[in-house]
């Protein structure tokens, strides 16, 4: 079984602990005067509440057909409109410049290289209207703890094992079923560098809009297109 197939059926369990982000992205969407786009929309965990709160459709993009099927079902159940598209965020293109593009639940970490992320950020910038916003979150990982965590098995939220590869900034996540995925962490300066090349301006960070500190465990960025 592939990661996409397995994960689409376990996503609600996997994401159960992440709820604080929904109100954050909903609030941004309410203040967006124009199209709203979610990258890595998954099963609509965030897009459905955003569409419900704003009364407007959300354009949702994901590479996983299995996750998009779940999103369609969840949108029908909630009686909201999602415009779902199977595609890669690195190739983002919209017919009308967006007022808000957001990428929740650390999904940008699935992009393995600087070039992949730079391309995505440039496509986001090209897809935003002047003054449009780009928001996303990613964990702030302390790589010095990686050796002590390598190979650890966790039962929650879904039974899995983590392997850490510091030289590659990579974490391999393998479910007990054998399905595997990888994420690549980035530092604060790497994120800020991506904003610079895409000519996006950081407004603030944190789900409570607090500033970044050395103790932050989650990066939450909101940037504005100049």
Task: List each model region and its residues.
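Conserved class I S-adenosyl-L-methionine
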Residues: 1-34
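A short glycine-rich, Lys/Arg-flanked "PGG" loop and its adjoining helix->strand segment in the class I
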Residues: 118-130
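Class I SAM-dependent methyltransferase "Motif I" SAM/SAH-binding loop
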Residues: 40-43
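Class I SAM-dependent methyltransferase SAM/SAH-binding core
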Residues: 47-91
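A conserved beta-strand element that flanks and buttresses the S-adenosyl-L-methionine
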Residues: 102-104
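A short acidic, Gly/Pro-enriched loop at the edge of an enzyme's catalytic core
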Residues: 93-100
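C-terminal lobe and adjacent flexible extensions of AdoMet/dcAdoMet transferase-like proteins
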Residues: 188-226
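SAM-dependent methyltransferase
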Residues: 135-193
